[in-house]
Structures are given as structure tokens and as C-alpha cells.
Amino acid sequence: MIRYTQMFGKEWKHDHKNFAERKVNMDRNAPIGVFDSGIGGLTVAREIMRQMPQERIVYFGDTARVPYGSKSQETVLRYSRQIIRFLKTQGVKAIVIACNTASACALETVKQELDIPIIGVIYAGARTAAEATHNGKIGVIGTEA
């Protein structure tokens, strides 16, 4: 199980250490945006709601263009930007990319483009796997993108 409270705290502090300096006005009551290429990211949204029940979630599952794994990196980046624009129109205060493919292909680029915190799931998943292994070995399965 991914510990999203740790992920929100530690990774956001690291990735957005200068966030406060940007003087972004963030409504504490604004929802958190979560997106995936389909419905699998609902498990991420559910865990966020379990660990942070006071938070509201706006979920976007891109079932019209699923799967992302067979798409080019440029296409995944374009889709991610489109979804992020939509989520921003919903007034989200932060975004979680709950799609491994989009996290791998788009996260670093869109972090530089946004004025709100954005995180992916790869780091937290890798950390959880590393903590869970008993023999020091981890298998990784990925998509073509």
C-alpha cells in the first residue's frame, strides 16, 4: 500500500521547496485533482480519501484514450497537459498523476510548467516496494512509452 500522506509531505516538500516563494494563493478548501489513463487511479483517489478524509477529490479517468502505454511520449505529454488544464479549471490545489505511464513521460515536464504542486506515483510505489522486499530484489514491469 502506498502511503500518500508520506508522499504528499516528503515529496512535495522536496519538489516544491520554493513553492511558498512563488506566492501562489492556494485555497485550502480546493480539491485535489487525480488523473489516470483509465479507472485504475480510482484506487489512488480512494487511498487519498481514506488517509485525508477532509480533502475533496476531482478524478479524471481518460477512458476515451486508454491505454497510454502504446502511445508515444509526446502523445502522453500532450494528453497530460490537456487533462491538467481541465483540472485547473476545476480549481484544484494540487494534482496527482495516478498513471505510471503519464508519471514517467510527463511529470518532470509539467512540474516546470505549473504553479501548483504535482506528484506522480512511481516514486512512492518504488519506495514501498523497496521497503517490502525481503531479498533486495524487485521486479519492474512497464509499458512501451
Give a label for each model feature.
Residues 4, 15-18, 25:
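Intrinsic-disorder-associated, low-complexity terminal segments enriched in Asp/Asn/His/Tyr and depleted
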Residues 23-145:
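Non-catalytic structural scaffold of enzyme domains
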